[in-house]
């Protein structure tokens, strides 16, 4: 519960900061009336509209909830699969899976996030190249066949034989 509250407060601070400096749009069901500087576009139909938002946004920002300590957030993969440029808070597992600055971009503080937004808004070709490389990696390595192959490659010897004998 505490992690969720901290995440909410971090996201509010981020949204308010970005709304003051950039053409920042938020797509959420959350009530933001107390924050008139935030442009809340409301929720989108995930299947129909989210891919258009992810692809059409110059920069998609993802803030990982504090309760999530490991793994690759599904939302990051969804953005990348739509050829969207993603700016996400630093996470060790993301750094292991993706080449920072080549397939996605990570930040470690609100100040660094703002700096990187400024930079990538001014460097469109670089931003598009990162989005394209991220898309290619997700399509190539984050599908069921690739994941199953990776699981089978990492299995202890004898597991497949045990599974065959079990059925």
Give the ranges of each region predicted by the language model:
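Short helix-capping/hinge SLiMs at alpha-helix to coil transitions
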Residues: 69-70, 123
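Nucleotide-sugar donor-binding catalytic core of glycosyltransferases
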Residues: 1-69, 85-87, 91-94
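Short alpha-helical segment that forms part of, or immediately flanks, the ligand-binding pocket
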Residues: 51, 74-81, 95
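C-terminal amphipathic helix plus adjacent low-complexity
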Residues: 114-167
């Amino acid at each position: 519960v505490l992690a969720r509250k901290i995440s909410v407060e971090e996201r509010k601070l981020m949204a308010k900061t970005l709304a003051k400096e950039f053409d920042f749009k938020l797509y959420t069901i959350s009530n933001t009336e107390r924050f008139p500087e935030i442009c809340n576009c409301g929720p989108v139909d995930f299947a129909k509209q989210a891919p258009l938002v992810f692809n059409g946004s110059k920069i998609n920002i993802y803030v990982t909830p504090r309760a999530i300590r490991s793994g690759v957030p599904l939302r990051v993969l969804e953005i990348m699969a739509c050829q969207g440029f993603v700016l996400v808070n630093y996470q060790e597992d993301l750094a292991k899976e993706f080449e920072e600055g080549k397939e996605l971009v990570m930040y470690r503080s609100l100040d660094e996030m703002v700096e990187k937004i400024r930079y990538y808004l001014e460097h469109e070709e670089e931003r598009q190249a990162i989005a394209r490389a991220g898309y290619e990696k997700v399509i190539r390595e984050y599908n069921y066949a690739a994941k199953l192959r990776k699981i089978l490659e990492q299995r202890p010897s004898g597991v497949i034989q045990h599974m065959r004998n079990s059925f």
